[in-house]
Amino acid sequence: VYPHSDIDALFDAAQQAMPGWAQASVRERIGVLMQVVDVLYREHLFELAHAVMHTAGQSFNMAYAGSGVNALDRAIEALVYAEQAQNAVTPSARWERQFGASQIMLDKTYRLVPRGVAVCFACASFPTWNAWPSMMASLATGNPVIVKPHPATILPMAISVRVFRQVIAAAGFDPNLVTMALDTMQDPIGKVLVQHPKTAIVDFTGSVAFGQWVERNAYPALAFTETAGCNTVVLESTDDLEAALRSLATTMCMFSAQMC
């Protein structure tokens, strides 16, 4: 049985953890998060693969790849993009302009300001696939994260959150930069999290219906959604019907029919 936290307390803790993290340099934040990647890979990868197997129902190979090494690839990619975006902002600039006989000169300084608390929804089928890069992107840019796993796949995200918190604390920062909000299918809290007044970012992966609700109701929070996809196939002609049918069957059934 997992503990259930008070939602307002989670947001308060996240906000209190943010100032020290925001004051750290981009390089320092990225370094801490790369350490998270290293610990997940070296110490927890097989544990996480089995956790996904026994919650999402995937084969070991699929869990190891889709919710393991490939998800870590995506986490690192998010860190790269976050570093590039932040380093593209110059720390200072001098502006000069002539107004008649007067020369106006301004020395400008710029600083990166986090948006605020991010809420990350992890999906039921591939819990870490989008959650890890989402968490990394928010944290790398100075934002604390509240993780909301799907009730069916809490274990892999609980392991992940524990690792994030341990590494962040070991680096001297407040571990409440990463927390977890749990619910059940009978008593969901997703809408409460999305519409909480302290929510600044919503990153949702899951059903089309709730994803559309998030897109309509997340404002003024910044919202990102990835929902299920289903593509139609028009078979115009083929010179090998058996091979074509085999390919279509593989497409429909691959990844235990869980991949979007």
Predicted regions: what they are:
Residues 107-108, 179-200:
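A structured beta-alpha segment of the ubiquitous adenosine-cofactor-binding alpha/beta core
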Residues 127, 184-188, 209-210, 231:
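Short acidic loop-to-helix transition motifs that present clustered carboxylates
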Residues 145-148, 203, 224-225, 234:
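Short hydrophobic alpha-helical runs that function as membrane-insertion/retention elements
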Residues 132-136, 190, 211:
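Generic hydrophobic/aromatic pocket-lining and core-packing "Φ" positions
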Residues 163-172, 209-260:
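ALDH superfamily catalytic-core signature
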Residues 84-171, 228:
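Conserved small-residue-rich beta-alpha loop and adjacent elements
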Residues 1-103, 137:
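N-terminal Rossmann-like NAD(P)+-binding subdomain of aldehyde/semialdehyde dehydrogenases
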Residues 29, 142, 178, 202:
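Residue-level signal for inorganic ion chemistry
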